[in-house]
């Protein structure tokens, strides 16, 4: 029978000093012997997705203590990728994921916590906490802050829905007047919560549902809606139940590694492909799988991407639907239900509610249940009122969206495409693969051959795009922006946004060893592995080289002979695999990240051979 980890510091005469300190935190005599549960919060005033989380830890803690546990809250850092975008701050975004994972491990292990509730929301925070949960393998429940409402404004007397990407794109479009840019800026992000489309933050919070580590509705219920409060209350109660089952009943099936098995990772990836999620999720799932010691690789992603259809298109892949519309259509349980009916889901994986994922679908899929409470839950909608307060409104749609032919979520029969929303491409320029969000690619450019134009940094690429160097037919190469080469593997949202703003969104391709924001769409191919700094072929491309991209056949080729590439490689070996003439100040923290980082196909995690 497992014993409470916290007994190390709460039991026995020799722990009198530790107990004295525990008492100073508010613990009483009868608290010693109860499970100590870490409430891992990520409140910060820097990030709209986290600005409302200050009081969430208290909500969870009250439920933990009422159910018989002891709650102890601490905070992690949180980086806002949108605010860090387009300058040196973006170099810190991906490394913050690993720092978050480490900080959670440090706090939980230093204080011998027995379990944890992870309160996350935005891009690197959910993955960092997920990596920590897999690493620690103690009972854990995830509950996120929720998505913000979509922005709305009138342009040319027409009401349109907006998000962060619209503000970025229109600001670079010289045909849009200053007044319209101002109106968009002031309307794009109206409430607290993670940005309103299927960007990285919302994608990851949806995937925790598929992994079985969060509650139904976690990925889609709006941050502002009163119904979201119940997710936090339930998380607090449920973590105590998981503690009882593990520590009192010796039931290891409640542990994260027992829930997030390889089958669960496949479910999460299938969901990601079906909903056209952010390409960053590939990076983070690979990293979490390594922490869980699950053999889940790019080969599995490639296999799944060839058979899972695209069942939902949400911003940035369309301006018609945002996360509030996904929720109205039944949320993640509805998409998983369609995958189950298409025989594309492992229905027997477990969840933190003690059910199988199949049992959860039967209970929460709006097309299967007539339960009025479930339908009411998924009718929760936006209020259209600017606010930074959670649970501040109780607006509801009149009906749910259960139209699986033309609605936000489709059945396999009426899928947006039988080919999924994400694809892995391989070829001589990406021997270990690269990733493209096919849900955001226009059908006219699924096959594309063009001339390379090479940039050694994101900044140089932005200057080239806005300066008129990039023309229709170009394949824009941005290299030395991978985990090592950046270092930090910054996102390339500005280059893709600017290509669209100058009318080249369907006329060019972009290939990088860096990564893309969840807000990216178009023929934008990232995670090219091996990266240039590791001797990848992308480091050998020269201006004017032909590159052939064939998404249907999952191929990407540099049309240069092997003999010529061998000559170039020898020359580059002599020079060293570094960007030419790039001026970039790199801190010691970033140098350390780059030194240990693997390429994107390994999740950009630490290379253990260097430890």
Swiss-Prot record:
Keywords: 2Fe-2S, Amino-acid biosynthesis, Branched-chain amino acid biosynthesis, Iron, Iron-sulfur, Lyase, Magnesium, Metal-binding. The modification N6-carboxylysine is found at residue 124. Mg(2+) binds at residues 81, 123-124, 491. It holds the Pfam family ILV_EDD_C. It catalyses: (2R)-2,3-dihydroxy-3-methylbutanoate = 3-methyl-2-oxobutanoate + H2O; (2R,3R)-2,3-dihydroxy-3-methylpentanoate = (S)-3-methyl-2-oxopentanoate + H2O. Binds 1 [2Fe-2S] cluster per subunit. This cluster acts as a Lewis acid cofactor. GO terms for molecular function: 2 iron, 2 sulfur cluster binding; dihydroxy-acid dehydratase activity; magnesium ion binding. InterPro entries: Dihydro-acid_dehy_C, DihydroxyA_deHydtase, DiOHA_6PGluconate_deHydtase_CS, ILV_EDD_C, ILV_EDD_N, IlvD/EDD_N. Functions in the biosynthesis of branched-chain amino acids. Catalyzes the dehydration of (2R,3R)-2,3-dihydroxy-3-methylpentanoate (2,3-dihydroxy-3-methylvalerate) into 2-oxo-3-methylpentanoate (2-oxo-3-methylvalerate) and of (2R)-2,3-dihydroxy-3-methylbutanoate (2,3-dihydroxyisovalerate) into 2-oxo-3-methylbutanoate (2-oxoisovalerate), the penultimate precursor to L-isoleucine and L-valine, respectively. The keyword Amino-acid biosynthesis applies. The active site is at 517 (proton acceptor). One of its GO terms (biological process) is isoleucine biosynthetic process. [2Fe-2S] cluster binds at residues 122, 195. Homodimer. This is Dihydroxy-acid dehydratase. HAMAP family: IlvD. The keyword Translocase does not apply. Belongs to the IlvD/Edd family. Its cofactor is [2Fe-2S] cluster; Mg(2+). Pathway: Amino-acid biosynthesis; L-isoleucine biosynthesis; L-isoleucine from 2-oxobutanoate: step 3/4; Amino-acid biosynthesis; L-valine biosynthesis; L-valine from pyruvate: step 3/4. SUPFAM superfamilies: IlvD/EDD N-terminal domain-like, LeuD/IlvD-like.
């Amino acid at each position: 029978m497992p014993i409470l980890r916290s007994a190390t510091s709460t039991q026995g005469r020799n722990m009198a000093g530790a107990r004295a300190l525990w008492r100073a935190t508010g613990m009483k005599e009868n608290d010693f012997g109860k499970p100590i549960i870490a409430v891992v919060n990520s409140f910060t005033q820097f990030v709209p997705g986290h600005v409302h989380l200050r009081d969430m830890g208290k909500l969870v803690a009250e439920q933990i203590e009422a159910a018989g546990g002891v709650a102890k809250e601490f905070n992690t850092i949180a980086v806002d990728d949108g605010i860090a975008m387009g300058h040196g701050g973006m170099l810190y975004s991906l490394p913050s994921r690993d720092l978050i994972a480490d900080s959670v491990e440090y706090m939980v292990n230093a204080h011998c916590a027995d379990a944890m509730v992870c309160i996350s929301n935005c891009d690197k925070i959910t993955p960092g906490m997920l990596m920590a949960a897999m690493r620690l393998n103690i009972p854990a429940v995830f509950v996120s802050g929720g998505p913000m409402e979509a922005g709305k404004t009138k342009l040319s007397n027409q009401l349109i829905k907006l998000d962060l990407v619209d503000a970025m794109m229109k600001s670079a479009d010289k045909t849009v007047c200053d007044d319209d840019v101002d109106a968009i800026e002031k309307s794009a992000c109206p409430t607290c919560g993670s940005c309103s489309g299927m960007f990285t933050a919302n994608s990851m919070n949806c995937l925790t549902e598929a992994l079985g580590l969060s509650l139904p509705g976690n990925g889609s219920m709006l941050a502002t809606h009163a119904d979201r409060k119940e997710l936090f209350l339930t998380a607090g109660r449920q973590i105590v139940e998981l503690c009882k089952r593990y520590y009192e009943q010796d039931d290891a099936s409640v542990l994260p590694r027992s829930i997030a098995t390889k089958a669960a990772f496949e479910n999460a990836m299938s969901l990601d492909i079906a909903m056209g999620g952010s390409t960053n999720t590939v990076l983070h799932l690979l990293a979490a799988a390594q922490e869980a010691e699950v053999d889940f690789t790019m080969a599995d992603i490639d296999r799944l991407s060839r058979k899972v259809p695209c069942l939902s298109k949400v911003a940035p892949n369309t301006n018609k639907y945002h996360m509030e519309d996904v929720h109205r259509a039944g949320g993640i349980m509805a998409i998983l239900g369609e995958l189950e009916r298409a025989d594309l889901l492992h229905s027997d994986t477990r969840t933190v509610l003690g059910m199988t994922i199949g049992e959860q679908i039967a209970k929460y899929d709006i097309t299967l249940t007539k339960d009025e409470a479930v339908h009411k839950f998924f009718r929760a909608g936006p209020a259209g009122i600017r606010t930074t307060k959670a649970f501040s409104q109780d607006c509801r749609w009149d009906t749910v969206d259960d139209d699986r032919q033309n609605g936000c979520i489709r059945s396999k029969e009426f899928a947006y495409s039988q080919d999924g929303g994400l694809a892995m491409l391989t070829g001589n320029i990406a021997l270990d693969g690269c990733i493209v969000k096919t849900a955001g690619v226009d059908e006219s450019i699924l096959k594309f051959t063009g001339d390379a134009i090479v940039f050694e940094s994101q900044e140089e690429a932005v200057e080239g795009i806005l300066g008129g160097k990039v023309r229709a037919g170009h394949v824009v190469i941005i290299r030395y922006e991978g985990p090592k080469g950046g270092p930090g593997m910054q996102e390339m949202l500005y280059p893709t946004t600017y290509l669209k703003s100058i009318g080249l969104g369907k006329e060019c391709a972009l290939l990088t060893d860096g990564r893309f924001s969840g807000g990216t769409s178009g023929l934008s191919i990232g995670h090219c592995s091996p990266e240039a700094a590791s001797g990848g072929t992308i480091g050998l491309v020269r201006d004017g080289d032909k590159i052939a991209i064939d998404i249907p056949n999952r191929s990407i080729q540099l049309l240069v002979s092997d003999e010529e590439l061998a000559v170039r490689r020898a020359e580059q070996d002599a020079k060293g695999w570094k960007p030419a003439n790039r001026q970039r100040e790199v801190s010691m923290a970033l140098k350390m990240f780059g030194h240990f980082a693997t390429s994107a196909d390994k999740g950009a995690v630490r290379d253990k051979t260097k430890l």
